[in-house]
Amino acid sequence: MKNSQRSRGAGSALGALLGLSVFSVIAGVLVAVLVAPAMAVSSAAASSTIDIFDSLPSYIEINAQPQQNRIFATKNGKPVQIATVYDQNRQEVAWDEVSEFALDAAVSGEDRRFFETGGIDVQGLARATIHNLATGTADEGASSITQQLVKNILIQKALTLPTKAERKVALQQAAGPTPDRKIREVKLAISMDKKYTKHEILLAYLNIAGFGGNTYGIQAAAEQFYNTDAKHLTAAQAASLIAIVQHPETRSLNDPANYPENKERRDVILGWMLAEGNITQAQHDEAVATPVDKTTVTITEPRNGCTYASKYAKYFCDYIQKSVKDLTALGADPETRAENWKHGGYDVYTTLDYDLQTVAQKASWELAPASETRLRLGSSTVSVQVGTGRILVMAQNTKFDDTGETSGRSVSSVNFSTDKSYGGSGGFQPGSTYKIFTLLNWLQNGHGINESVDGSGRTVSQSTFSDSCNGPWTGPYTFGNDEAGEKGSYTVAAATAKSVNGAFISMSLQLDLCEIAKTAKSLGVHRADGDPLETRPSSVLGVNEVAPLTMSAAYAGIASGGKYCSPIAVDKVIGPDGATLPGQDAKCHRALESSVANTAAYAMASVMTGGTGGQSNPNDGTPHIGKTGTTDESNQTWMVGASRKVATAVWVGNVSGHVPLRSYLSNGSYGATIRHNIWRTTMLEVDSKYPGGAFPPAASALLKGSGITVPNLAGLTLPEATAQLKGLGFTLTVTDQISSALPAGSVVRSSPGAGTIASRGSAISVVTSNGKLAKMPKVVGLQFADASGRLSAAGFTTISELCIPLAPSNAARDGYVVASSPGSGRTVKRTDHIGLSVGRTAC
């Protein structure tokens, strides 16, 4: 750059010689005439203008201007950019990152005496003054590069003001065609030139200049119009970009209609560059011969916002945007953080594992197609790292677009994974995945997983439930099980594996519904809409609408041995000044005693091996725990589980409407299996990258818990059985009477059965005998008459003889029973036919 090494010339020397106050007289008078020629006839007006000039502030700083924010994930262990977000499309660059051609074009095109003046071009002002006096207009403004920089800085400051009215006033003051504005601009330009070097001013100008639309700065313009960096701009490209700044509305390269006017101005600038000796004749001729058309202009549309983020990470990008209010690195309060984010320049390094994200996102699109027309099918997959709360995966089956430019069933700006306040929906009922919090509270109260409870569906009075938060409840509550044959007693472990509704209601009847909710809250569980958790009896079976992210983090707390970590999405932030700032702190606390968490995990492991979650199991050698969830009519389906390293929640269901997924067939599989297929696919990749080991064993004290062994009641009378159970803290309920060989009214069997463990206070169901059965007595070896008598005495009424011939040598056995049908010891009805085989020497 020929002029870049020049010292300040005559204008600058004049300013230094005369001093700012004397120079202000010249500038003030010239400005007065420049912006309002009619005022020139009045010396009083000129004097007034000088007074105004002297009273104006003379302090202005070159500050960092709004820039792009960049969001990064991790791919193959290295950062990868997934999104660019900005209020203004600008990337500030350093002096050595700008082409010499661009530096020269700016000076040649905007302020050829830039290196010779003291912030304002006195010659230019004089020339413009003469022109304006002659024409009676204010056509020529004679703004130097420094003045233009001042104006742009003031415009940027105006745009940061909080209200529309304040911004309007400030913008008028910064850019309006008024004498006051021009005088102020001149004063500040003179001051700026005294404070900063020419290089600093020129670079700041190139970084702040507007190039049409929302594009600011030479780097963003180079990328948008030529798909290159500012450092690599050619002479023709640089001159074309500088041609834009005076009149972007008619010279911007965004519109082909502007190409002719842009070329005309470009060629003028190239001529000045040649005249100044900044380019050779050959360079000039080559540049002028370069057309401004679609062959040379390469439009690269700015990809601003999450709609233009990586296709695999758009919803996570939106979650980061919504989480800015939580990033303490950006400021002391949410308002400051939002303002700093708007100003930009931050590089945000997130927790997202791009490798896992890609797998989960592809599975969501393939297995749960949002284009499905038979229902509004939605799905979400969220993975959270155990022990840290770091969000590794956030995928869903729709395509993100918050611009309104696309529409259809497959498009949504709603993030199914998150709470409503973070761009999410109102959440979805989690069904039986919520039962785990009853299991945990059961263990917290000293109960064991081998205790047996009634698993039958039935109707109970809601007044029998304890709820210290919102009770008492009134009216009947009717509930059933998923399978018709699920009834009778179940151990808590078996009920967990098979997801037996009745068993968990029985457990909750021995607990406090409020305390169950508190256990859930300790693991971060809350409603997605922000309302308090409901605690009515049906809440045990999962009626509170929650976000998948919430459930994934809660299960991660169980997998960690009881340490809950709230979900975080940002590892670190690099500020506009290059300083490393903290990300989101892992806010962890002990939510559960390790004995409780490990015993619950022990029960949850059976879900994956022989229970309702078996279809989700990757069977890759990594131990998993989990729980399935299906709401009424299978409107919503869930699979939530974890290894020792990562927890994953998958929701598949109706975004709106009530189409049963069990009746929905897609790709040869019913809708209720989609969750399993997505979870299995995701966790296969998770386990290969984050291999998890064995879970700790259950606490021995919580296997039996505080339960009591049920005694053997068979053969006891009801009073005897009642007394024995009462002494152990149980109650007795007769559920049926059956045919039995035991005396009428005596106990045949109990549920839970003898030897099982039941909670103190449990009702033990018994079945009694009606006495209509008898055991076949032993009659073989008796004389037929004696055998018949014994059978008659036992109540048998139909007896017949079958003659078995004897050899003469066995005459001593004549008349003896050699066999009976049925055989001895068999339980039969007294009305059944009894056949006796009798040996006879003569049949």
Regions inferred by a protein language model and the residue ranges of each:
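Juxtamembrane regions of bacterial inner-membrane/periplasmic proteins
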Residues: K2-W365, P369
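Conserved catalytic neighborhood of penicillin-recognizing serine enzymes
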Residues: A134-L159, E301-A309, H447-I516, P576-S606
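A penicillin-recognizing enzyme superfamily signal
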Residues: T350-A370, M394-N397, D402-P430, Y434, ...
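Short pre-catalytic segments that frame enzyme active sites
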Residues: R70, N76-Q91, A220-Q224, V245-P256, ...
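Bacterial peptidoglycan biogenesis and beta-lactam-recognition machinery
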Residues: V98, S108-D121, A134-G141, M192-T197, ...
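Residue-level preference for non-acidic, small/hydrophobic
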Residues: P79, A106, L149, I201, ...
